[in-house]
A protein has these predicted regions:
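ATP/NTP phosphate-donor binding region
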Residues: 1-84, 272, 292
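Accessory alpha-helical/coil subdomains and C-terminal extensions
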Residues: 2-11, 15-19, 25, 40-49, ...
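Short, well-structured alpha-helical segments in soluble
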Residues: 75-88, 241-248
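Short acidic, glycine-rich surface-loop motifs adjacent to enzyme active sites
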Residues: 87-102, 249-263
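A short helix->loop->beta-strand "cap" motif at the edges of active sites that frequently abuts
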Residues: 90, 115-118, 279-284
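Short Gly/Thr/Asp-enriched flexible loops that form oxyanion-binding sites at enzyme active sites
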Residues: 95-117, 169, 266-275
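Internal gly/pro-rich beta-alpha loop/helix module
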Residues: 121-194
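C-terminal non-catalytic interaction/assembly regions of soluble proteins
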Residues: 260-329
Length: 329
């Protein structure tokens, strides 16, 4: 734990997990050929001034490229968040994270924490070694949100925009403002250190406390796979998963998310296989692969839909549902 400022009534704790924001390349003009997770979170805070009345502290939770994010890191991160959120002098948390799976981690934390204080994930599209890194400004903005008196819930801050964990998606491979909230739009903007709120902060999930307890106690997390519906899609991958399950494999599939076209439509061959999987006890959920919009339910649908959740977020929701079912059974 590195304390950056000592004299204050309220603290913002920055938890580091790696990512591009802590990446380093061999040349300052190289924004893509870097190694993620090279710079410690305490070093990222050098030169970052705390807002008035706030002390900064840093804790390294993990140091990975976020493409390699794991359930084990998620569990540890959730536990460290819960620890700090219980501290009475904590104003809020900031988590530095890679952009690739940031939306998954944000959604997971929103589902298992019930924060009455802000938990702010931030990131960078350029490594720390870049000529003009975007990480320092994103970190300043994230700290401003974490210190905002009325802020709460799990949010993402990137390029001056604040997104809800439920709606945020990475929508660009390279641009600095790589995230978007689709139809819902952003929650707020950060302008010269001031937070301009546009809509309500995220509400806590009533099931979060129970979900947290279950993931903390779980020896294994349910296996949930994502399969894409597309032209000439087939059910062979579903059949492979079912055959592995029938043989009593060490980690049998328990859930399948279908990344569906349009308003939740699925190729007939893939749908037939998914219905067979459902009949054999596998939980199946449809989520639209469209960047915006939600699935509007239609009568007679035999496969559940995930509403406005993206396939990767639907996977997390289904995993937590399966954990709850196992606990109840």
């Amino acid at each position: 734990m590195d304390h950056i400022s000592e004299k204050s009534a309220r603290r913002v704790v920055v938890l580091g997990t790696g990512g591009t924001i802590s990446g380093r390349a061999g040349a300052a003009n190289d924004n893509i050929g870097y190694t993620a997770g090279e710079v410690g979170v305490a070093d990222l805070l050098h030169g970052i001034d705390a807002p008035a009345g706030i002390a900064l502290a840093a804790e390294q939770v993990a140091q990975v490229d976020s493409k390699d994010m794991s359930f084990a890191i998620w569990r540890t991160l959730a536990q460290r968040c819960a620890h700090w959120l219980a501290e009475p002098d904590l104003a809020g948390l900031v988590i530095t994270h890679g952009t690739d799976t940031l939306e998954e981690t944000a959604f997971f934390l929103q589902a298992v924490l019930a924060p009455s204080k802000p938990v702010v994930l931030t990131c960078a599209m350029r490594p720390a070694s870049a000529l003009a890194p975007d990480g320092p400004q994103n970190l300043r903005d994230a700290i401003a949100v974490a210190a905002a008196p009325d802020a709460r819930g799990v949010v993402v801050v990137c390029a001056g925009t604040v997104h809800s964990a439920v709606e945020v998606q990475k929508v660009h491979t390279y641009r600095l403002d790589a995230f978007d909230s689709g139809d819902a739009g952003p929650l707020a903007y950060v302008e010269e250190g001031a937070v301009r709120q546009l809509r309500d902060w995220p509400q806590a999930d009533p099931a979060a406390r129970s979900s947290f307890d279950r993931i903390a106690a779980a020896t294994a997390w349910p296996r949930v796979e994502i399969l894409l519906s597309h032209a000439e899609a087939r059910g062979s991958l579903v059949e492979m998963l079912l055959e592995e399950r029938r043989r009593g494999g060490a980690e049998p599939v328990q859930g399948i998310v279908l990344a569906a076209t349009g308003n939740g439509t699925v190729h007939q061959a893939l749908e037939a296989a998914a219905l067979r999987a459902q009949a054999e006890g596998v939980s199946v959920l449809r989520a639209t692969r469209c960047a915006e919009g939600r699935i509007l339910p239609k009568p007679g649908q035999r496969l559940r839909d995930a509403g406005a959740l993206t396939p990767v977020k639907a996977r997390i929701a289904l995993m937590l549902e399966l954990l709850a079912d196992a606990s109840a059974g």
